[in-house]
Amino acid sequence: MFLRWSPKKAALAYPVPPAPPTAVLVPWFRPAGQVRVFPKGWNAEAAAFAPAAIVGSWPQLAGLLPERIPSLTHAVIVVASSPDQLLTEARRNRLWQAFRVPIFEQVVAEDGSLLAAECEAHDGVHLESEKLSVDPRLIEVEACGCGRATPRLRPAGERTRAVAAYAR
């Protein structure tokens, strides 16, 4: 079996390097190191890879909620193409209940380039690129628990409250 490398796609930015064996279920990234891309999503080949981490969109990961994935020990990374697709608190809790591993979120472009990413402090999604357009009411500028001072989108519950407060 040959893996095709596409120079136009970025490698996955794993939240807490180094990346363990990771199954990427979206075609936005190129394989690198222990990161393998399964563009057709979760299937027998992805299961045989026995990933310690899984990367996918919310619909893909929601489809895996009833699955038992014994090798999954490190993380679930939810990728979205816009901030509007980030997880609600309820969806995040469903992933945690099903997989019992840390949940991370990333906003990425179709070429896999990182636009925003959640850190290990899980206190919002750090803005990584000026290409990402975000409602200023949803941005937190105070230092994060991870030590970074970059602006970030507030956590899901706080994003909802900020918009609701503005609407009053």
Language model regions located:
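Active-site glycine/GP-rich loop and adjacent strand/helix microenvironment
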Residues: M1-R168
